């Protein structure tokens, strides 16, 4: 109804100390890191989504439009008569606790835990809470945009389908009076190079009656993801569970991949089914929306819903001791049977995987909710190597190979 340029000049606002827009002064570490859930603000500390953002790690800077930032959020207040415009990058919001009602210039989106939302750079929006508190994760990319991964040999069907991404229906607010403070002007918070600025305008920023185009916020219900998996043997790379990606100019690498580990059947035979111990060139920030991750036990002292972990490039990691021993005990029975099993319906873990090495924010590295004993989850790992059984397996494999060679020779003759 009125153009967004109709506002007073921006002036610097107080930027929370735990919100970062560049990471040159953050620290790097090859150690495995884990955090318990981000503490929620107390009732006497009203905190909205913007001021509840808590930067965990990142690479590059918003100023260079290069890299990314990983944040968590915990808030207990809706954004009333205000909005956020993020000039720094595109946001992927992953609610873990508490549904969000997101107002934008394009309309409304209901985003409960189990769904995710992408907010493009430069769109004005406000986050309202549908419960007393809310908590979750945010991936902010300074370069590129989220897109569906190239499915390659998978073909047309699988993973996240384009038809399941939902855009808001046009909705508008025709008012020139604040709901919370009649007579006051609306507040526009502008995030620019990691700093917050503020301007006032005499009308609601959500006064767009209709829109068209392909640059808009959207949400996705993670239960609609169609997982692919190994159906014979071995353990596929987690990239096979990619929902969205922000590719780099270098083929095979990404500014960030958003990967989920949803309920699914695990059927591989003669295989250690959980993610095995490994090192890789990517950096992995993991979160847990609900349930239990198959390679880490949940509960106090474990990987809790709302918690997070970080494993950097070439740092070894894998199942904790309890998960490892449980899988060894599950192995093929004495009769050779190796039945499938289904991961619980209430599980939903995810990963932000990135090619750029993350630097950890000082406040996150020294946080009281950081699990400094994380490394102890691998204490007690022991060898199950059986020399005699291994020798028999090698001999049996050699015999099978000799038999196949003999058949080929007969056919050739």
Q: Model segments located where?
A:
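Jelly-roll (double-stranded beta-helix
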Residues: 1-413
């Amino acid at each position: 109804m009125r153009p967004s340029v109709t506002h007073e000049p921006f002036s610097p606002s107080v930027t929370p100390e735990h919100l970062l827009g560049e990471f040159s002064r953050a620290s790097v570490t090859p150690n495995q890191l884990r955090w318990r859930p981000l503490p929620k603000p107390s009732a006497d500390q009203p905190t909205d989504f913007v001021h509840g953002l808590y930067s965990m790690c990142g690479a590059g800077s918003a100023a260079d439009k290069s890299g990314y930032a990983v944040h968590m959020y915990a808030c207990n207040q809706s954004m009333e008569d205000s909005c956020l415009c993020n000039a720094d990058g595109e946001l992927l919001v992953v609610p873990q606790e508490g549904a969000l009602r997101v107002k934008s210039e394009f309309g409304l989106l209901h985003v409960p835990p189990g769904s995710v939302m992408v907010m493009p750079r430069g769109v004005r929006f406000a986050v309202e809470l549908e419960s007393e508190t809310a908590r979750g994760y945010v991936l902010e990319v300074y370069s590129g945009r989220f897109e569906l991964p190239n499915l390659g040999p998978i073909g047309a069907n699988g993973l996240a389908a384009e038809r399941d991404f939902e855009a808001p229906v046009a909705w508008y607010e025709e008012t020139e009076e604040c709901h919370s403070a009649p007579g006051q002007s609306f507040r526009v918070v502008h995030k620019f190079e990691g700093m917050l600025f503020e301007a006032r305008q005499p009308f609601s920023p959500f006064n767009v009656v209709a829109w068209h185009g392909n640059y808009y916020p959207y949400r996705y219900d993670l239960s609609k993801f169609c997982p692919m998996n190994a159906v014979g043997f071995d353990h596929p790379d987690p990239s096979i569970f990619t929902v969205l990606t922000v590719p780099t100019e270098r083929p095979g690498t990404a500014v960030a991949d958003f990967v989920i580990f949803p309920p699914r059947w695990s059927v591989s035979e003669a295989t250690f089914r959980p993610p095995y111990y490994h090192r890789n060139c990517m950096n992995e920030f993991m979160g847990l929306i609900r349930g239990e991750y198959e390679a880490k036990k949940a509960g106090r002292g474990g990987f809790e819903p709302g918690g997070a972990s970080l494993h950097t490039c070439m740092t070894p990691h894998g199942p904790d001791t309890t998960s490892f021993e449980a899988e060894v005990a599950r192995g093929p029975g004495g009769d050779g049977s190796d039945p499938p099993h289904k991961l619980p319906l209430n599980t939903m873990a995810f990963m932000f995987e990135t090619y750029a090495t993350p630097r950890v924010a000082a406040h996150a590295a020294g946080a009281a909710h950081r699990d400094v004993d994380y490394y102890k989850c691998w204490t007690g790992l022991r060898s199950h190597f059986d020399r005699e059984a291994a020798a028999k397996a090698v001999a049996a494999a050699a015999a099978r190979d000799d038999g196949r060679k003999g058949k080929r020779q007969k056919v050739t003759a």
